[in-house]
């Protein structure tokens, strides 16, 4: 993404016409993308290979950590980052339609902003004007054990950003957009989890996504060995997995982290992942409480 690029009415219309923000699974096109032609983000951008056979476009370290938390969720069937919100009221084919109890009518951000008495942002250039298109950082589809589906919308912010009144107003519009569709909306900040947990998530991502799926037999064996990991170092744990699964250390890393991601090896993610640090094993409930999305924790307090 280039710092010199700017959002313009023409650019927004071009994105809409090209199909950005549409599609499912491997065919989804994010609204904002990490490309040389896109305006730059304020954070450090990331392109990550995921389970959906495409690259995911993440615009900050916080979004990368949120993405890691999201990919751990049981039943995750689709993940769409940089998901655009409709500006106009319409009959929708939006991801949230499956959650609607009644008519699939989507109220656009222009109507919602007016109802809330808030100014809707716009983009101007040379006398041309276009309503700004809001986007939600992550929109998750979950298949539940009961056979139903759930949609979770996640917005990622730094806590310092919430000191600005205009930021809160824009978030209020985004929250209301999803609330009117019956969708759970989570505001995720770094204060909802420790820095060490975030570091563990980012360390584990490289071994869980874009890597070959570990054999089910190896994952099951790792889960069976998990109680013995308590008090051991990462190096000791990897050696044990290597020996019992008869694999390389690289393969042992993938087996270990993929087992953690499934919740079958419930480690304390706040413990350092350096080779000399020791692990603490947790109950399944305590393990999932470390994940703010799984726990449905939100920084929104208004």
Feature names for model-found ranges:
Residues 1-302:
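Electrostatic, structured charged patches in enzyme active sites and in nucleic-acid/phosphate-binding
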């Amino acid at each position: 993404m280039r710092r010199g690029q700017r959002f313009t009415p023409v650019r927004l219309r071009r994105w809409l016409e090209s199909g950005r923000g549409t599609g499912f699974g491997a065919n989804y096109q994010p609204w904002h993308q990490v490309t040389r032609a896109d305006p730059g983000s304020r954070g450090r951008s990331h392109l990550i290979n995921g389970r959906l056979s495409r690259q995911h476009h993440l615009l900050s370290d916080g979004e990368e950590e949120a993405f890691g938390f999201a990919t751990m969720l049981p039943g995750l069937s689709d993940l769409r980052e940089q998901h655009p919100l409709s500006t106009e009221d319409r009959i929708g084919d939006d991801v949230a339609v499956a959650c609607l109890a009644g008519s699939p009518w989507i109220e656009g951000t222009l109507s919602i902003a007016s109802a809330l008495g808030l100014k809707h942002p716009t983009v101007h250039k040379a006398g041309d004007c276009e309503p700004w298109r809001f986007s939600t950082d992550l929109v998750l589809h979950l298949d539940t054990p009961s056979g139903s589906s759930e949609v979770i919308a996640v917005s990622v912010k730094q806590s310092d950003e919430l000191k600005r009144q205009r930021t809160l107003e824009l978030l209020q519009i985004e929250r209301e957009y999803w609330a009117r569709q019956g969708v759970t909306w989570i505001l995720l900040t770094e204060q909802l989890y420790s820095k060490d947990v975030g570091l563990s998530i980012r360390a584990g991502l490289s071994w869980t996504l874009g890597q070959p799926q570990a054999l089910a037999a190896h994952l099951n064996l790792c889960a069976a060995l998990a109680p013995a990991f308590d008090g051991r170092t990462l190096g000791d744990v990897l050696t044990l997995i290597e020996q019992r699964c008869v694999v390389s250390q690289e393969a042992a890393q993938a087996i270990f982290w993929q087992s953690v991601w499934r919740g079958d090896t419930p480690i304390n993610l706040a413990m350092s992942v350096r080779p000399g640090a020791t692990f603490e094993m947790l109950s399944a409930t305590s393990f999932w409480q470390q994940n703010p999305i799984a726990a449905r924790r939100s920084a929104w307090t208004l």
